[in-house]
Amino acid sequence: MEKISRTKIVDLMKREDFGAMVNVKGWVRTRRGSKQVNFIALNDGSTINNVQVVVDLANFDEEMLKQITTGACLSVNGVLTESVGAGQKAEVQAREIEVLGTCDNTYPLQKKGHSMEFLREIAHLRPRTNTFGAVFRIRHNMAIAIHKFFHEKGFFYFHTPIITASDCEGAGQMFQVTTMNLYDLKKDANGSIVYDDDFFGKQASLTVSGQLEGELAATALGAIYTFGPTFRAENSNTPRHLAEFWMIEPEVAFNEIQENMDLAEEFIKYCVRWALDNCADDVKFLNDMFDKGLIERLEGVLKEDFVRLPYTEGIKILEEAVAKGHKFEFPVYWGVDLASEHERYLVEDHFKRPVILTDYPKEIKAFYMKQNEDGKTVRAMDVLFPKIGEIIGGSERESDYNKLMTRIEEMHIPMKDMWWYLDTRKFGTCPHSGFGLGFERLLLFVTGMSNIRDVIPFPRTPRNADF
């Protein structure tokens, strides 16, 4: 086979030098035709679009042609030709074909449609489908957008540890990390495990958040962001929860709650605009195939300012809805941690646009959030989105050493684990704020997928760690 430099299909579709010899490589999506001519839809993953390879059967070995089945991998040399078919600009008239990899007839991704549940069971193959090819290209582009946004605003990308001895959220739902023999654990007189001989000499876990370390960096570098995997040992089998997911967490010195809300709104709008501008084909495919209102919803986020509403006012709106006959599964009262149905009512039914809810009761929020003067609420903020509910959670951080100490004691957090965090309040404390965006929740919104397990390549959930 003549050696010709490969052209990606995404680039091939932009070329207009018809008559040129080209090489394309990819996997067969479909093959159809007559006894004289076959049409092969070839895809290499660079785009949602296939290139049509036109094969004059008389010019090729019959035994080789038998190997060209759905899923087979081909290298094709041919003439780039202007297509007469609708929906495609160019096609390739095959001159040489090499089968790089045959595909066994047990290949599960045949031309028929497959359920999302079935595709989760073959997560090692599902990126080859149109749907997951689109989702994972969008995932890549969203990661690029995140780095680009913060770089352009002068933030520093800061790497925080995955193994930690602190629990940022105080929930205790952490995966432990140990090298100890689980069948011969050393225990003290009270029956508690002794970690002195463990690898780190203390109890260690996988991180639930890089926020605390991010705060340390912000008080030195001014503005930082983290972007990495986080882990929650929360036994939740829902379409919104994963045990392993990715978080983006900016922290900014001297920002108070208003600047924090401004940053969150600007950031998420930037990401949505990036998806519409740079993933147009993939977004359109998902809009047409899965969620007819996807593009309209994405564009709607960009058109108006987000509503900014105190938690107390949000509760009043929900209580009024109940009084008028609206049924919620979970009760509404001041002090409740809002359920997704409450959040979505505010966004989808009442305001019909994203909402930033602020000033939550301190009893339902984390220890590090700055307390308001009323003594009952903290300067927390949650960004609520249609179809998703909470997509961002953040706050102005408590900068007062004594107030932070008191809150840590109230929540029974071991002081020995927090000395380094408290040091930042002893040595040149400053106002600072930040938030966390669950990457997969952003992807749920941008792709229109309904289950968070379908926007991450290999989902980790209770009793599921395959691949």
From Swiss-Prot:
Top-level enzyme category: ligase
Enzymatic reactions: tRNA(Asn) + L-asparagine + ATP = L-asparaginyl-tRNA(Asn) + AMP + diphosphate + H(+)
Keyword Nucleotide-binding in record: yes
NCBIfam families per the UniProt record, alphabetical: asnS (TIGR00457), PRK03932.1 (NF003037)
GO terms for cellular component: cytoplasm
GO molecular function, one term: asparagine-tRNA ligase activity
Keywords carried by this UniProt record: Aminoacyl-tRNA synthetase, ATP-binding, Cytoplasm, Ligase, Nucleotide-binding, Protein biosynthesis
UniProt GO BP: asparaginyl-tRNA aminoacylation
Family: Belongs to the class-II aminoacyl-tRNA synthetase family.
Complex formation: Homodimer.
Compartments, record wording: Cytoplasm
E.C. number(s) listed in UniProt: 6.1.1.22
UniProt xrefs under InterPro entries: Aa-tRNA-synt_II, aa-tRNA-synth_II, aa-tRNA-synth_II/BPL/LPL, Asn-tRNA-ligase, Asp/Asn-tRNA-synth_IIb, NA-bd_OB-fold, NA-bd_OB_tRNA
Name used for this protein in its record: Asparagine--tRNA ligase
